[in-house]
Amino acid sequence: MKGLVITTDDLMRTEEYTTPLHESIGKTVGGWIKVVHPKLLPAPYCMIVNEEGLLLGLPVNLLGSILYESFRHGNPIVGNIVFCKEGFVEGERDIIGLDDDDLKCLGALISAVSGGAVKWAVSYTHLRAHETLMN
């Protein structure tokens, strides 16, 4: 299952997750996960955050806080966040992965909302492979 990660350093990357999701996504967000539904994020997308991020003193995630409208209620989103979709698995509501169209849609939304501040992380493995092909 693919998710879209936004770090507190304003870097964006795709990441592959396995079940149990609370463990694999938990590693990315740094602890217990909480699914939130920001008003500025269209359905069926959701944002997964660290449930105890404020208690742990994690840094503010500006993009997450903007989407969550933290300026209205004063509760910021902190730490790395993972975007996924909600859907149904075997008839039960669950978190499901993103496909390529979802990644393009969310990438465009994130770029627009952040004014271009959030950028795709550079894959050094990809760069090395490209250099090898050029030689």
Indicate where each model-derived feature is located.
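Short, structured protein-protein interaction patches enriched in aromatics and acidic/basic residues
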Residues: 41-63
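Ubiquitin system architectures
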Residues: 74-84
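Conserved small/polar residues in nucleotide/adenosyl-binding loops
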Residues: 125-132
